Amino acid sequence: MSNTRTVHSSTSISKMNSALQISCLLVVLGCLLGSGHCQSEAEFAAKSREIAQVFGNPSVDKYTKARNLPTLIAFYEKYSSRLRLTPQERISINNAMRQYKAQRNQQVDGVSAQGGWLSDIIKTAISIIVKAVE
């Protein structure tokens, strides 16, 4: 039996290690991105149901809806690209969001305004978003 030994240069070992590390990194990134997408889908579905339960249910009172407006706005800002909306609906919602935020930022004697009513444009935006998530 012959004892032959293969001698590798340090350069070839280094290249092989780098290639192996890059391959492992790509596999890990692929797994993370894939699971992140799944979590994002599940989160989107759960939040959509939550929005529809509050804003799509006629038995929910207007005060509960008003209290949940920040949740609706956060949902829209995070997931607006996933909602099937026409350009006109998108413009209408964006205008309503700006109007709502401007109203919320108004201060009376150094304190944010409390209470208030939901204007027709905000009600329209809510109905468009609810229709899109159902």
Swiss-Prot record:
One of its GO terms (biological process) is cellular response to UV. Induction: By a variety of stressful conditions including bacterial infection, heat shock and exposure to ultraviolet light. Pfam families: Turandot (PF07240). The keyword Glycoprotein does not apply. A humoral factor that may play a role in stress tolerance. Belongs to the Turandot family. This is Protein Turandot E. It comes from Drosophila melanogaster.
